């Protein structure tokens, strides 16, 4: 936020690219950093804040490892890790963000192309495909036929845009573009390597959470659809007589909520992590630590209910109805 408390954004790419999948977005180069510097110089913040912001860009986004990364997704993993460490009192944080779809893609290629696992059967066998179609239909993150929504097992990438696929006669097809791919292990493997195919959210989570048993935390929507996916996967495993997978998944937790909490404000606006750097005050740092040690999870969560309301309905809550539940730290 600038001195007028108006949100300003630094754009790495043109806004026309906002709908492009991260999966196929190319890595940014040094010229992007140079453009960011120009945007910082034109922003309505103090000269001291411009220096702080430029230092952040240099330390995080102009980092040599980030600039040498092969893809934008790899850059995000590196820069988010570095961003956490550049926040006040957060130097010891080791938060790593990885691309779920890439993990699922590599696991398919290494372990599920030919071995008769439940994942192999769901993707490549006619019986498994039919079971997937019956059990995952209508689940958010999977697919719906009427009205058409989501994609069956994979998304296709053509001209840097996602294509939704349906199952038709053993092929994945997009009828609007005549795109067609045979669900053959060699073909699917090649398309995953070239990043022409992306595992859907449903397939990715089924592999990571259900087949391998990793606990996957997520937002308030995920705890709903991940639970639905678990029962869909269990039904498929039962029909395929895959008892080993069946036993493993029964202990998988699907309601692990991971949510943001609001602690910092600029006047009456929620402050971002970048604001925390630009408007940092020693007394605010001390008060934040005190707040984190004293407030309850319930109190912290309730501060974001208006934000959840906006996400779900598209409408904003009148500030007079927002309860002052926890002590608010003002950076200005």
Residue ranges and their predicted role:
Residues 215-218:
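Short hydrophobic beta-strand that contains or immediately precedes a catalytic carboxylate
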Residues 39-179, 191-194, 212, 267-270, ...:
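Aromatic-residue-lined binding/catalytic grooves and analogous aromatic/hydrophobic interfacial grooves
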Residues 13, 30-43:
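Active-site-facing alpha/beta catalytic cores
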Residues 182, 186:
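Extended active-site and interfacial segments that coordinate phosphate-rich ligands
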Residues 1-30, 192-194, 206-207, 222-293:
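Catalytic or ion-translocation cores adjacent to nucleophile or general acid/base/metal-coordination motifs
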Residues 1, 99-103, 220-222:
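An acidic- and aromatic-residue-enriched active-site/binding cleft used to recognize and process polar
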Residues 189-190, 196-212:
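Short, hydrophobic/aliphatic alpha-helical segments
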């Amino acid at each position: 936020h600038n001195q007028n408390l108006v949100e300003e954004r630094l754009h790495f790419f043109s806004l026309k690219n906002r709908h492009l999948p991260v999966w196929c977005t190319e890595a940014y180069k040094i010229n992007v950093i140079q453009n960011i510097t120009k945007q910082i110089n034109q922003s309505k913040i103090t000269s001291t804040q411009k220096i702080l912001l430029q230092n952040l860009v240099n330390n995080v986004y102009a980092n040599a490892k980030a600039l040498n990364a092969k893809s934008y997704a790899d850059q995000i993993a590196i820069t988010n890790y570095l961003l956490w460490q550049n926040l006040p009192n957060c130097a010891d944080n080791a938060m790593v963000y990885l691309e779920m779809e890439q993990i699922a893609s590599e696991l398919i290629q290494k372990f599920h192309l030919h071995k008769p696992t439940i994942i192999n059967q769901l993707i490549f066998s006619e019986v498994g495909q039919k079971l997937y179609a019956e059990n995952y239909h209508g689940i958010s993150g999977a697919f719906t036929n009427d009205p058409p929504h989501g994609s069956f097992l994979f998304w296709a990438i053509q001209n840097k845009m996602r294509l939704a696929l349906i199952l038709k006669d053993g092929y994945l097809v997009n009828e609007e573009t005549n795109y067609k791919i045979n669900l053959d292990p060699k073909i699917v493997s090649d398309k995953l390597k070239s990043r022409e195919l992306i595992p859907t959210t449903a397939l990715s989570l089924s592999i990571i959470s259900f087949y391998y048993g990793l606990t996957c935390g997520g937002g308030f929507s995920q705890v709903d659809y991940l639970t639905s996916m678990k029962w869909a996967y269990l039904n498929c495993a039962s029909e395929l007589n895959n008892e080993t997978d069946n036993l493993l998944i029964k202990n998988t937790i699907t309601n692990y909520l991971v949510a943001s909490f609001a602690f910092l404000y600029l006047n009456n606006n929620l402050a971002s992590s970048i604001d925390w750097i630009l408007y940092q005050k020693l007394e605010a740092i001390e008060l934040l630590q005190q707040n984190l040690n004293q407030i309850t999870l319930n109190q912290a969560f309730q501060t974001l209910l208006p934000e959840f309301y906006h996400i779900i309905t598209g409408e904003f809550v009148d500030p007079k109805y927002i309860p002052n539940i926890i002590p608010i730290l003002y950076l200005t």
